[in-house]
């Protein structure tokens, strides 16, 4: 079974408090990827709460973002219809809320080992790499691919470095 994981394509990461020109530039690529994908599509959603500034992440990245229920927390409008088109027993509406860099319930969500995963989204050097490595840990023999043309890092340099780390862990990187 093929699974496309769209990582954190939320307003705050695209054109909000942590948005970048690179993140804005990948939106059309991600939309085309989603439209043409044959398989199941899941979205991760970075989720913080009003106490964000008191968390470890808030102390190290003192920019409030993706606060639950805010506009910045929302999946971008270009992808929202694709994100909210399913319901299953584990994931509500195809969106997996995560409260740290990586989603930690992969094994509960995908109980079998017969999956191929493809990831894209933001930020390559934080949440994309964290989720790719978590998938590698839970599914050591799975084909895991990251589409570089559908990812953006905090900076272009960090994007490139994260791609190299993923390659080192037998994650296929395409469209560099």
Language-model-detected regions and their locations in the chain:
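Active-site acidic carboxylates
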Residues: 1-91, 112, 145, 154, ...
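Acidic, Mg2+-coordinating phosphoryl-transfer loop and its flanking beta/alpha structural elements
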Residues: 139-142, 146
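Active-site catalytic pocket residues across diverse enzymes, especially alpha/beta-hydrolases
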Residues: 83, 107, 139
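Conserved N-terminal glycine/acidic-rich loop preference
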Residues: 90-130, 152-176
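Histidine-anchored nucleotide/phosphate-binding helix
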Residues: 29-36, 129-139
């Amino acid at each position: 079974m093929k699974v496309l994981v769209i990582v954190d394509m939320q307003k705050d990461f695209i054109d909000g408090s942590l948005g970048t020109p690179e993140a804005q530039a990948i939106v059309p690529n991600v939309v085309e990827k989603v439209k043409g994908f044959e398989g199941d599509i899941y979205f991760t959603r970075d989720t913080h709460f009003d106490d964000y500034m008191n968390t470890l992440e808030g102390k190290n990245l003192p920019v409030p973002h993706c606060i639950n229920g805010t506009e910045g927390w929302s999946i971008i409008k270009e992808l929202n219809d694709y994100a909210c088109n399913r319901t299953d027993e584990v994931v509500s509406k195809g969106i997996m809320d995560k409260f740290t860099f990586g989603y930690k319930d992969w094994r509960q969500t995908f109980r079998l080992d017969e999956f191929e995963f493809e990831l894209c989204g933001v930020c390559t050097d934080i949440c994309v790499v964290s989720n790719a490595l978590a998938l590698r840990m839970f599914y050591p023999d799975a084909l895991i691919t990251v589409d570089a043309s559908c990812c953006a890092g905090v900076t272009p340099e960090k994007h490139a470095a994260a791609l190299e780390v993923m390659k080192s862990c037998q994650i296929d990187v395409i469209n560099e």
